[in-house]
């Protein structure tokens, strides 16, 4: 049987919010079975809980943000959400003392390090998966994203199309058979990226105030400005894949199926997930409880070495 997972104990980290520029202290705490991922704003009195689910995503401007009916938010959750998906974490309390998750280095890797540092505990309940039964497609102009049935795991195929000298001749398509190992080694270190020409406008809108060469890949009109260059030759499309993994984990369960997308982003990823969940005949919840049952997605174990 493949079981639900949480952490063995609590762990804390401090960083800066990518868009707010504010210092953030974040604490991960183990949660009971069937809790899901729950974000808590501990700077508010009383503390406000925001469960991670697709319907709570009410802002997708340059990030994924959970926002409740009162307007309380936790923003920029996508990189952490991707790390939780990659590590197969089902149940967790995420406490933050600010409206945003810290950006760390702009990738999911520091979150994975924190999760591995304290260790993962299996719980006495079967892990649930969302298995795709029917194809679903959403579009926005020339952009599109879709799910298809696929019983052998979670297969992802994502393509971007940026018209910029740095992207010319560079692979802008990424295909992934999702697993804990493939995520950690091939995707998790890909950083968020942005263009110098956009930064002044973004900051005038109180966005990207915490962005820097320490937590993002920055491009001018011709080149990458980071002295150390790229972590992967195709880091840009891999970061978009990372974002999609995080956005699609807003159902609190790993997906068994195929995801294909062209020029997708946070809004379209969320639109696709909502469209799927709204069509009950298009998916089913499955578990692998038999003694010999093997789930089609393999997750981190203590033998996995960080990339």
From Swiss-Prot:
InterPro entries: Ribosomal_Su5_D2-typ_SF, UDP-acyl_GlcNac_deAcase, UDP-acyl_GlcNac_deAcase_C, UDP-acyl_N-AcGlcN_deAcase_N. One of its GO terms (biological process) is lipid A biosynthetic process. It catalyses: a UDP-3-O-[(3R)-3-hydroxyacyl]-N-acetyl-alpha-D-glucosamine + H2O = a UDP-3-O-[(3R)-3-hydroxyacyl]-alpha-D-glucosamine + acetate. Disulfide bonds: none annotated. Its EC number is 3.5.1.108. It is an enzyme of class 3 (hydrolase). Zn(2+) binds at residues 79, 239, 243. Its cofactor is Zn(2+). One of its GO terms (cellular component) is membrane. It comes from the Bacteria. The active site is at residue 266. Keywords: Hydrolase, Lipid A biosynthesis, Lipid biosynthesis, Lipid metabolism, Metal-binding, Zinc. It holds the Pfam family LpxC. GO terms for molecular function: metal ion binding; UDP-3-O-acyl-N-acetylglucosamine deacetylase activity. Pathway: Glycolipid biosynthesis; lipid IV(A) biosynthesis; lipid IV(A) from (3R)-3-hydroxytetradecanoyl-[acyl-carrier-protein] and UDP-N-acetyl-alpha-D-glucosamine: step 2/6. NCBIfam families: lpxC. Belongs to the LpxC family. Catalyzes the hydrolysis of UDP-3-O-myristoyl-N-acetylglucosamine to form UDP-3-O-myristoylglucosamine and acetate, the committed step in lipid A biosynthesis. HAMAP family: LpxC. This is UDP-3-O-acyl-N-acetylglucosamine deacetylase. It comes from Aeromonas hydrophila subsp. hydrophila (strain ATCC 7966 / DSM 30187 / BCRC 13018 / CCUG 14551 / JCM 1027 / KCTC 2358 / NCIMB 9240 / NCTC 8049).
């Amino acid at each position: 049987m493949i079981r639900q997972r949480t952490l063995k104990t609590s762990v804390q980290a401090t960083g800066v919010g990518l868009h707010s520029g504010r210092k953030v202290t974040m604490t991960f705490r183990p949660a009971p079975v069937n809790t899901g991922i729950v974000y808590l704003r501990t700077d508010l009195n009383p503390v406000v809980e925001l469960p991670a689910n697709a319907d709570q995503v009410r802002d997708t401007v340059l990030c994924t943000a959970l926002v409740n009916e009162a307007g309380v938010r936790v923003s920029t959750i996508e990189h952490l959400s991707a790390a939780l998906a990659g590590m197969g974490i089902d149940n967790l309390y995420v406490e933050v003392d600010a409206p945003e998750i810290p950006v760390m280095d702009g990738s999911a890797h520091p979150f994975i390090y924190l999760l591995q540092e304290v260790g993962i505990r299996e719980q006495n309940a079967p892990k649930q998966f969302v298995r795709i039964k029917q194809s679903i497609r959403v579009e926005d102009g020339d952009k599109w994203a879709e799910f298809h049935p696929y019983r052998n795991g979670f297969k992802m195929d994502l393509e971007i199309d940026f018209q910029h000298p740095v992207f010319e001749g560079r692979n802008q398509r990424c295909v992934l058979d999702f697993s804990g190992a493939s995520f950690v080694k091939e995707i998790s270190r890909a950083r968020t990226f942005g263009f110098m020409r956009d930064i002044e406008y973004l900051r005038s809108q109180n966005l990207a105030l915490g962005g820097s060469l320490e937590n993002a890949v920055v491009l001018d009109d011709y080149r990458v400005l980071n002295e150390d260059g790229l972590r992967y030759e195709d880091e840009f499309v891999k970061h978009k894949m990372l974002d999609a993994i995080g956005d699609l984990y807003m159902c609190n369960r790993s997906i068994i199926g195929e995801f294909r997308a062209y020029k997708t982003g946070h809004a379209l990823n969320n639109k696709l997930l909502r469209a799927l969940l709204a069509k009950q005949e298009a998916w089913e919840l499955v578990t692998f409880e038999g003694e010999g049952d093997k789930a089609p997605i393999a997750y981190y174990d203590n033998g996995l070495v960080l990339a």
